[in-house]
């Protein structure tokens, strides 16, 4: 489905990429891990990590009784865990989602500078104006958005339940505004037939996957199944043997008979995917330039900021201003409404909501 003529035009945004963390020696890594484990106990804290963080961070979360999952499950785990402090290894909107669900807890992030192109590409002032121009539309936003954008929405969705919710709204004759990921929105529109006004954002990682290069790689590995996250361009999604959220792609690798998979999502997912499918071969899908001219090169630069040194600092720094997440209470209450609406809808379907990027 082509974008609505009323939707904002696609702008090429040159996102300011952060510098990569300085590599640590094995001895330094061991020291930081030991220190983090001790501080988690002392501070009554638990570490939750997103699928797209580096493998050693995911392993540390598991070793210390935390969790590795998508952003909504991270927030729910933190809400239900008895720890008073939640360390969120991910990007800023994930920390905000955790605070929305657990206002009484201290939410810390390794760095508040870890952001997301979907968040940056959907500033609340412009999104408000877009929604105000179409007051008869129901506003549906992806979970990969700021607390302010969530507060403006009627529904918040993850990629695992977006199809069902949009189908439900469409069956009721609702006109829909979708934001911010244009690729995911187009995929949902194609699957459901719903008419949607689409915000024109994208994920810098998934937007770089290229169908022509993927086709060439498939020729090299004809027996490989192609797994694609729906934040990818339509031409890439069209080549997929399985399309789904992070958790759904992990499940596909585990259950499909293929011994080899070409995976079109952030390579951070390989850690949990390999756990779920030991012995199977995982291959990165090609990005723009086959590594020569790609920008993200299949790994989110902001996720990469969640290093051991930064995690230790979030626990040890006496000044928490560069780590602690705050959400205005009025905004939090408003953002909680569409989140709760999604969770309640999921209960009626008897399904567990997982799977935003």
From Swiss-Prot:
Q: Which GO terms describe its cellular component?
A: cytosol
- Which BP terms does GO give this entry? 'de novo' NAD biosynthetic process from L-aspartate
Chief place where the protein resides: cytoplasm
This protein's cofactor list reads:
[4Fe-4S] cluster
Q: Where does [4Fe-4S] cluster bind?
A: 116, 203, 300
A Gene Ontology MF term for this entry? 4 iron, 4 sulfur cluster binding
SUPFAM superfamilies, alphabetically?
NadA-like
Pathway the protein acts in: Cofactor biosynthesis; NAD(+) biosynthesis; quinolinate from iminoaspartate: step 1/1
Which protein is depicted?
A: Quinolinate synthase
Designated gene of the protein: nadA
